[in-house]
């Protein structure tokens, strides 16, 4: 019985060695034909961490889970008219430039306001801008910029305005069923691999449409077919909520609006989280406002009555005065911002995504080590 078992083990070992040799030969041939790294074991990847770029909003970074937009992925931002979609995208442009990157803006709607973009912190002298004549031209320009590997962020505003050339050349009233959807589907197939390879973030802004005849469920949909929905790693639903009244002499005027941003799809962190931000007219997202709210909830900033204090020092009576204090003291702002990000694990050393991957890799290494020890003992 023992001889039969030993013989079976020898046959199994021989068969396993042959399979491994065949696999090694196949990998060598693939590497020779397609280059190093064409096929690799997941644990051998040099970069396992999900790299992100801040969205420019602390509340949105928290809602995204990983600390910002994932690099090398597609992001879709959609919502009703005047909800703040372009504002959210422009904050990402400003953040990319702040981090030393290059950003491009494909303005298919031909409606970008340079003065407003500059007010949000965008360096308009360095921003690459294209106003294409057709949808194919806009997507082709985006593709060439991404393929260059020199651009960190590409924003397309908007998918609904990417009109196929055949529709432009035709007459109003002509039927072009599915033409835009086919164009977007082809573009996604071509762009997705290049976006991932170059670690470019591609943000597509989209509008809303309503399905005709829907009596039950949500009648809202986004134009451009389903391809963008499938290829997007992150989808954000932006909705304006309540108006923000001014103070003092502006108390009878609306100076901004509270906006809800819901992460309806997320491939790098848990989805369905929500961020509430204040979009001030002419200024964009109030970074001081969201920081005060979040830090107060975490008791990093203490609130007693109408007074806000930090480290035992009063920083303002009422939120407006506290905002002004943080705006005038950027060092204090950065210090509080850092504490909030550490709390949510969004700093580079404390990223929840990184921690999980490192833990899994350590477990895998321990398992390999245990197997090696077991083989040595058996021999």
Swiss-Prot record:
GO terms for molecular function: ATP binding; ATP hydrolysis activity; ATP-dependent DNA damage sensor activity; damaged DNA binding; single-stranded DNA binding. GO terms for biological process: DNA recombination; DNA repair; SOS response. InterPro entries: AAA+_ATPase, DNA_recomb/repair_RecA, DNA_recomb/repair_RecA_CS, P-loop_NTPase, RecA-like_C, RecA-like_N, RecA_ATP-bd, RecA_C_sf. Its main location: cytoplasm. It holds the Pfam family RecA_C. Keywords: ATP-binding, Cytoplasm, DNA damage, DNA recombination, DNA repair, DNA-binding, Nucleotide-binding, SOS response. It is found in: Cytoplasm. GO terms for cellular component: cytosol. ATP binds at residues 79-86. Can catalyze the hydrolysis of ATP in the presence of single-stranded DNA, the ATP-dependent uptake of single-stranded DNA by duplex DNA, and the ATP-dependent hybridization of homologous single-stranded DNAs. It interacts with LexA causing its activation and leading to its autocatalytic cleavage. Belongs to the RecA family. This is Protein RecA. It comes from Streptococcus agalactiae serotype V (strain ATCC BAA-611 / 2603 V/R). The lineage of its organism: Bacteria, Bacillati, Bacillota, Bacilli, Lactobacillales.
């Amino acid at each position: 019985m023992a001889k039969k078992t030993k013989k079976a083990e020898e046959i199994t070992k021989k068969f396993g060695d042959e399979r491994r040799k065949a696999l090694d030969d196949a990998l060598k041939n693939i590497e020779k034909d397609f280059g190093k790294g064409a096929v690799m074991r997941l644990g051998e990847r040099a970069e396992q961490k999900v790299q992100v770029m801040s969205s420019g909003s602390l509340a949105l970074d928290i809602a995204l889970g990983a600390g910002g937009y994932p690099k090398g992925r597609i992001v879709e931002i959609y919502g009703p008219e005047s909800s703040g979609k372009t504002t959210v995208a422009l904050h990402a442009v400003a953040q990319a430039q702040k981090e030393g990157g290059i950003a491009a803006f494909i303005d298919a709607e031909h409606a970008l306001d340079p003065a407003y973009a500059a007010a949000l912190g965008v360096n308009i002298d360095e921003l690459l801008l294209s106003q294409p004549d057709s949808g194919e031209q806009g997507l082709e320009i985006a593709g060439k910029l991404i393929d260059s590997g020199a651009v960190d962020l590409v924003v397309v505003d908007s998918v609904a305005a990417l009109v196929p050339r055949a529709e432009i050349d035709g007459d109003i009233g002509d039927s072009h069923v599915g033409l835009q959807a086919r164009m977007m589907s082809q573009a996604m197939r071509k762009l997705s691999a290049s976006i991932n390879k170059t670690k470019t973030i591609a943000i597509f802004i989209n509008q809303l449409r309503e399905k005709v005849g829907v009596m039950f469920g949500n009648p809202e949909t986004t134009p451009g077919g389903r391809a963008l929905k499938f290829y997007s790693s992150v989808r954000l639903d932006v909705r304006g909520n309540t108006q923000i009244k001014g103070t003092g002499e502006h108390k009878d005027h609306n100076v901004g609006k509270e906006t809800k941003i819901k992460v309806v799809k997320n491939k790098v962190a848990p989805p369905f989280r929500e961020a509430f931000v204040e979009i001030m007219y002419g200024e964009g997202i109030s970074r001081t406002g969201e920081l005060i709210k979040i830090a107060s909830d975490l008791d990093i900033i203490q609130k007693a009555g109408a007074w806000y204090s930090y480290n035992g020092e009063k920083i303002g009576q009422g939120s407006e005065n506290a905002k002004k204090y943080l705006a005038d003291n950027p060092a204090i702002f950065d210090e509080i911002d850092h504490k909030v990000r550490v709390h949510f694990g969004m700093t580079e050393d404390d990223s929840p995504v990184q921690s999980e991957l490192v833990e899994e890799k350590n477990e895998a290494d321990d398992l390999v080590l245990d197997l090696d020890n077991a083989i040595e003992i058996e021999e």
